[in-house]
């Protein structure tokens, strides 16, 4: 299998599972994507910020333990981001509270941007920069994707210039089709939308593909969408057709649903 250089930029957090909050896991869209790409055998680099605290040390350790390069992990004054999560009996998660901590306001430094330009593909997670990094990478000719679903503020959800725009429509087929249309007309070259238990769709405007889910015994869905993104990106950049890329994302997402957290890790105390 060919190995590629991937970067994931943006959010990290400590997922605190309720009730009560007695155990925690390292997570976040960009972190989870980076870890899953590394676990697939690729070179993965994480670009983001942590606090100078115990939670920041947990994030750094989680990345290193999974082979993700932390050369561009920055420490800032303030707390590491955290999320309080409740899990339903069916394994679905409810985000009770989010504190973005030092992830808020993070921007790659000039030297970081030069490093990003050397990557085969860059994925952006939650990033409150008004789309500045997306536009700069696109103008530099870098393949870049972003998960629009984790960026709630309108200023941060543009798709123009994206090689791949990812989104989530729940199980609403009509909304999924609208998102595909909006991403493509908005300037993304490829649109990929997950539909929960109904699977996923992808289209580049000329070719469309769909995939169902892989049934598993669900323990926790946290990070399943991030794993889907990693699996899809890795397959797509290797030249696999849209349908096969969706299947790769589906299979990795299904595996993630069989354990707690966005990637296999031992729980840590709060």
Features from the language model and the residues they span:
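Conserved N-terminal subdomain of the carbohydrate kinase-like
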Residues: 14-24, 42-121
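Alpha-helix C-terminal capping segments
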Residues: 34-43, 235-238
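Conserved phosphate/ATP/ADP-binding segment of small-molecule kinases
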Residues: 138-210
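Positively charged, low-complexity intrinsically disordered leader regions
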Residues: 1-21
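Short catalytic helix/loop segments, enriched in acidic residues and glycine
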Residues: 23-37
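Glycosyltransferases and closely related glycan-assembly transferases
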Residues: 117-118, 131-143
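Conserved phosphate-binding/catalytic region of the ribokinase-like
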Residues: 1-5, 177, 181-270
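Hydrophobic anchor at the start of a short beta-strand
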Residues: 6, 43-44, 70, 142-144, ...
């Amino acid at each position: 299998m060919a190995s590629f250089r991937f970067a994931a930029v943006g959010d990290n957090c400590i997922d605190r599972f309720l009730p009560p909050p007695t155990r925690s896991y390292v997570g976040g869209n960009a972190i989870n994507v980076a870890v899953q790409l590394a676990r697939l055998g690729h070179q993965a680099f994480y670009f983001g910020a942590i606090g100078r605290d115990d939670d920041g040390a947990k994030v750094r350790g989680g990345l290193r333990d999974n082979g993700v390069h932390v050369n561009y992990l920055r420490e800032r004054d303030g707390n590491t981001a955290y999320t309080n999560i409740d899990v339903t009996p069916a394994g679905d998660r409810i985000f009770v509270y989010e504190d973005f901590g030092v992830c808020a306001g993070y921007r790659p430094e000039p030297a970081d941007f030069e490093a990003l330009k050397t990557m085969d593909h860059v994925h952006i997670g939650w990033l409150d920069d008004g789309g500045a990094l997306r536009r700069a990478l696109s103008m530099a000719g870098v393949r870049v994707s972003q998960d629009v679903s984790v960026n709630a503020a309108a200023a941060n959800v543009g798709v123009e210039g994206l090689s791949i725009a990812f989104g989530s429509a729940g199980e609403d087929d009509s909304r999924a089709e609208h998102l595909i249309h909006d991403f493509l007309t908005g300037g993304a070259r490829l649109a990929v939308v997950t539909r929960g238990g109904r699977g996923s769709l992808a289209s580049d405007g000329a070719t469309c593909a769909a995939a169902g889910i892989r049934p598993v015994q669900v323990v926790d869905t946290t990070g399943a969408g991030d794993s889907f993104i990693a699996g899809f990106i890795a397959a797509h950049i290797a030249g696999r057709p849209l349908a096969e890329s969706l299947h790769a994302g589906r299979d990795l997402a299904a595996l993630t649903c069989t354990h707690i957290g966005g990637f296999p890790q031992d729980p840590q105390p709060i």
